[in-house]
C-alpha cells in the first residue's frame, strides 16, 4: 500500500490503497468481538467496493482470515489476487487470480512475496503511464 499511496519509482499522483493489517484498534476489536478469522473480511465489508482489488498474502494459502476476506470480496464483486506458497492451498482455488511460489520454505515464500509486490507496483506504474 505504501508504494501505491506514496511512490514506487517516480513522483506521481497518489493511488488509492490501504493495508488491512495496520489499524491495531480495528484488529483487536474485531478479533475480540468476531474472531481473528474475521479481521480482514469485516474491514472489507465496511470499505470495499466493486472497483477495488484485494490482494491476500498467505504462505500456506489456508489462512482462515485471508480465505474469509476472499469470500467477502467475491460477494461484493471485488477482484481478488492470492499470493501463496507451497501448493497454493484453498486460496488458490477461491481467488480470482493466484500467484503461487513453488516452495516449502516459509522464508523463501515470504521473500518472493516481497519481490512480487514490487513487480506488481512496477507494472501498475508502467501500465498507468506513471513512469
Specify the residue positions occupied by each region the protein language model found.
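Glycine-rich phosphate-binding loops that contact phosphosugars or nucleotide phosphates
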Residues: 1-130
Amino acid at each position: 500500500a505504501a508504494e501505491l499511496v506514496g511512490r514506487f519509482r517516480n513522483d506521481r499522483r497518489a493511488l488509492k490503497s490501504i493495508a488491512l493489517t495496520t489499524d491495531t484498534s480495528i484488529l483487536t476489536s474485531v478479533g475480540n468481538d468476531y474472531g481473528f478469522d474475521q479481521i480482514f473480511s469485516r474491514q472489507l465489508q465496511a470499505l470495499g467496493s466493486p472497483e477495488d482489488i484485494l490482494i491476500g498474502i498467505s504462505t500456506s494459502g489456508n489462512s482462515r482470515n485471508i480465505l474469509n476476506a476472499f469470500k467477502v470480496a467475491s460477494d461484493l464483486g471485488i477482484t481478488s489476487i492470492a499470493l501463496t506458497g507451497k501448493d497454493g492451498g484453498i486460496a488458490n482455488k477461491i481467488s480470482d487470480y493466484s500467484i503461487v511460489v513453488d516452495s516449502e520454505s516459509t522464508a523463501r515464500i515470504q521473500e518472493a512475496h516481497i519481490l512480487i509486490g514490487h513487480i506488481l507496483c512496477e507494472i501498475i506504474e508502467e501500465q498507468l503511464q506513471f513512469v
